[in-house]
Amino acid sequence: MSTQVSPNYQLLRQSDIFTPEIIEDIQVKAELGRYRIRGYGTLRERRWSTFDDLTFIPCTLTRIPLEGYRERCSSTTILGTRFANTPIQLDIPIMITGMSWGALSYNAKVALAKGANIVGSSNTTGDGGMLQAEREQSKTLIYEVLPSRYGFDIHDLKAADAIELTIGQGAKPGTGGLLLDSKVLDTIAKQRDLPLGVDQRSPARHPDFLGPDDMIIKIEELREATDWEVPIFVKMGATRV
């Protein structure tokens, strides 16, 4: 017996992988000739992550503590000691990743900055540049350099505590970004130098380097721009380089 998927499509066989929703999505994409513009992560049914999902790597040859319950365990993490004159120090080995003003509201960006301070972590600007309030509220702020370069400002770059050169991310490896016109408000359009009410489409690759050799040159350029003061990270999704 066939399963009804939509008014226009019939699913003849159902499996654990190709559910009615996935089959319908494939059919709609084929009909449109492009991807569907909609929210995925917030709409799909997903199990919330718990501490059970964390895997701690054991140190099997480390000295065994004589009184483990009394000895202090430090989670302090220092990044950038190899090249940067001013490394960053975090109280915990967890960082808040880049989420742009536009994808998130102004209040959400400021709240993330304050929350990062409370737990001793760092905050990241995301696409579209740096908010002044975000800089003021962040003890440790990472400036994200993306392929789009929307809102890029060399002065904001120098005001950051670290730089993140984004090659890709796990949420959308190998693809660019899209900020719908409904979110490109007057203030956001001004900061990103975009026409008001027009979709912002971000490319998947940087315009000024093509491969790993060129990327090294870009990193050196960023080091010179910041006088070798701050750490520089490279962010990429778990993909083939």
Model-predicted regions and their roles:
Residues 139-145:
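Charged, often glycine-rich, active-site loop that binds/positions anionic groups
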Residues 1-94, 98, 103-114, 121-122, ...:
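Conserved, well-structured core domains of diverse proteins
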